[in-house]
Design a protein with these regions (language model features):
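Acetyl-CoA-dependent GNAT
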Residues: 3, 7-13, 17-82, 86-98, ...
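Well-formed, non-transmembrane alpha-helical positions, independent of function
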Residues: 15, 116-117
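A cross-domain feature marking catalytic cores of carbohydrate-active enzymes
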Residues: 63, 107-109
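Conserved active-site tyrosine of GNAT-family acetyltransferases
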Residues: 118, 123, 143
Length: 148
């Protein structure tokens, strides 16, 4: 099934929240957090990946003149490994490159698949945040990519 990327809308939140719960519980964002992010369209860029069955992934970027930050990215478990996460990340990086000279992100230290994707896209680890993800207490690896 073909997957298309488009801007996230408030109507996507039920599907995004269901994926968020499946992928990231107990360290999930809330509906109010996402609604707040979507209202800040001047500095936020959120996209979803969808096919005929609905939303299969999403990603978000916070972008300022001096730096951008990948705030979230996720792909349905049954669609992982198909390149959807890479397409979502590439969409965020294209937007980040228009706005900012550097992109930062935090990734769960135990998420080797995501760390590998970020490294393939030019990110390097620059630090670690102990017990960053709450309530699980999982560490985060801080990664950085400078615009080439």
């Amino acid at each position: 099934m073909s997957v298309e990327l488009r801007r996230m809308a408030a109507g996507d939140l039920p599907a995004v929240l269901a994926l968020e719960e499946d992928l990231f519980a107990p360290d999930t964002w809330t509906a109010s957090m996402y609604r707040d992010e979507l209202r800040r369209s001047d500095t936020r860029h959120y996209v979803v990946a969808e096919n005929a069955s609905g939303v299969v992934g999403w990603a978000g970027l916070i972008a300022y003149d001096d730096e951008a930050h990948v705030s979230t990215i996720g792909v349905a478990r049954d669609r992982q490994g198909e390149g959807i996460g890479a397409r979502l990340l590439d969409a965020l990086l294209a937007e980040a490159d228009r706005r900012s000279p550097v992109v930062l992100l935090e990734v769960r230290a135990d998420n080797e698949r995501a760390i590998g994707l970020y490294e393939r896209r030019g990110f390097t680890a620059i630090g670690r945040r102990p017990r960053y993800y709450q309530p699980s207490g999982t560490d985060a690896v801080v990664m950085k990519r400078e615009k080439s």
